[in-house]
Regions:
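Short alpha-helical segments that sit at the start of domains
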Residues: 1-25, 88
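Short, Lys/Arg-rich nucleic-acid/phosphate-binding segment
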Residues: 73-79
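Short helix->loop/beta-hairpin flanking segments within DNA-binding domains
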Residues: 23-36
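Short, amphipathic alpha-helical interaction segments positioned at domain boundaries
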Residues: 87-93
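Short acidic, hydrophobic short linear motifs in intrinsically disordered regions
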Residues: 33-45
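Basic amphipathic alpha-helical segments that dock to polyanions
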Residues: 59-66
């Protein structure tokens, strides 16, 4: 396997891992309390778990596009919340 192939495989795993870790963070910390979470808070939490900022932001965007998250803009900042579908997914496991 070449170095380029290894890099591509690592990137592919990274983005799937970012989404999985995002759902874990949401399930552990947002689901029980409800409410909204700032983008920066989620990016920082995912960063502590080894997810790069770009991957964390991509995971947020893609998860929202799937209808699992809602967003509310406050000036230049965004807060995220679980949609009814996201809430249901995390509660049912």
């Amino acid at each position: 396997m070449t170095q380029g192939e290894t890099h591509v495989q690592t990137k592919a795993r990274g983005s799937a891992g970012a989404r999985s870790l995002l759902l874990t963070v949401l399930g552990e910390f947002v689901l029980p309390r409800g409410g909204e979470v700032w983008t920066g808070t989620l990016v920082t939490a995912l960063g502590a778990l080894g997810v790069e900022e770009k991957s964390a932001r991509q995971a947020l965007s893609r998860t929202a596009a799937e209808g699992l998250l809602g967003s509310a803009r406050h000036g230049r900042r965004v807060r995220w919340s679980l949609s009814p579908a996201g809430d249901r997914l995390l509660r049912e496991g």
